[in-house]
Amino acid sequence: MTQGKKKKRAANRSIMLAKKIIIKDGGTPQGIGSPSVYHAVIVIFLEFFAWGLLTAPTLVVLHETFPKHTFLMNGLIQGVKGLLSFLSAPLIGALSDVWGRKSFLLLTVFFTCAPIPLMKISPWWYFAVISVSGVFAVTFSVVFAYVADITQEHERSMAYGLVSATFAASLVTSPAIGAYLGRVYGDSLVVVLATAIALLDICFILVAVPESLPEKMRPASWGAPISWEQADPFASLKKVGQDSIVLLICITVFLSYLPEAGQYSSFFLYLRQIMKFSPESVAAFIAVLGILSIIAQTIVLSLLMRSIGNKNTILLGLGFQILQLAWYGFGSEPWMMWAAGAVAAMSSITFPAVSALVSRTADADQQGVVQGMITGIRGLCNGLGPALYGFIFYIFHVELKELPITGTDLGTNTSPQHHFEQNSIIPGPPFLFGACSVLLALLVALFIPEHTNLSLRSSSWRKHCGSHSHPHNTQAPGEAKEPLLQDTNV
């Protein structure tokens, strides 16, 4: 009996210690200083900088592990990860409303970075863990909730923009650094460095990041129930057909983001394998594209919104997306990829413009619901797009015969056609499929009114909206302003 009491006391002490890791006595956030956007920025930068270092090594390991069906397996791996993220993101968001953001920042960063050290230990385990890590690979969702906790509504657009710009900045520099270190010292050093940066990120969250969700905003008990309707990933998608304008916007988003998600997952692999880009050239391409995308989503977007209006900006962005996908599809020379990349950067204005249209036309109490639907559709595309692109590459027999030599200069490369089937007329079939999909999106977007009010008339919608209009769940317009270079694991 005495032994049982001792065990019970030890268990109680462990529970109290776990609570104190996140919240100090009296409910004061633990960490360095008050919660700020800069805490979120550092977390995002370190996580994606670590993954960015592995851009070139991942391409090599992917081909060595799956030499016969590289594109297909890449699509399946990223597709499984995307679908798991889509299914788990609402639940993790709902749980973070109950238990706070810090614990889930720690959880998502840990599991997102868990595959990194496995790259050299066991490639098979590396790709297996990448697939299942999608359950927790939702750092952005938790970070945006963290930012929403500590900012006023009018400040969130700028705060989200800062987070997105930091994400882009990490990808502008890290692939080039990783490619250089890999060429000089070997890929093993790059993996060790990426692992160290991931551990630094975890330590930073444990020691320096204060909890952002006030104690008074949480349920009194750790065992408090969560809203399972809020945790349902299909809840917002079920509401799509209840308003014709919302339906048009969501169809436009689905048809345009499906090929974009597939492109994110495979394009750098395509440059490396089919177009014979060296690791340094891929890194330079990512850097240039990231810089141009930031410029397009800030300066150019602002000018276009003022000069030609919201709807026309969306149409222009879709037009650029069609052009760049067609160019990627038919392009057979490296210089064509660089030229199409500039057009691709311009196409990144589409989703900020879509989000701005929704923000401007939806009622204040419906912002979270409509933005949540768009986010849900994009999450679904993150699962379907990579698998679709991988399958199209597979059925057209676009596969690698041998990797180009590291450090090869693009100006002296032989014809890239030697890297795919000789009877292939179209170098990049999935990109042409994507261009057709975006063309359909453009036709649908023509029917979206420039000035309208998203009056969601269904009483069930109104009831649903009431449960989603919590300030921590509302997605500000800036949340959709993501950089073009979203995928960092390939």
UniProtKB/Swiss-Prot annotation:
GO terms for biological process: acrosome assembly; sperm mitochondrion organization; spermatid nucleus differentiation. The keyword Glycoprotein applies. Keywords: Acetylation, Glycoprotein, Membrane, Transmembrane, Transmembrane helix, Transport. Residues 62-74, 125-126, 182-188, 265-284, 335-337, 401-427 are cytoplasmic. The chain crosses the membrane at residues 41-61, 75-95, 104-124, 127-147, 161-181, 189-209, 244-264, 285-305, 314-334, 338-358, 380-400, 428-448. InterPro entries: MFS, MFS_dom, MFS_trans_sf, Sugar_transporter_CS, Tet-R_TetA/multi-R_MdtG-like. GO terms for molecular function: transmembrane transporter activity. It is found in: Membrane. Signal peptide: none annotated. It is a multi-pass membrane protein. Its main location: membrane. Belongs to the major facilitator superfamily. This is Hippocampus abundant transcript 1 protein. It comes from Homo sapiens (Human). The lineage of its organism: Eukaryota, Metazoa, Chordata, Craniata, Vertebrata. The gene is MFSD14A.
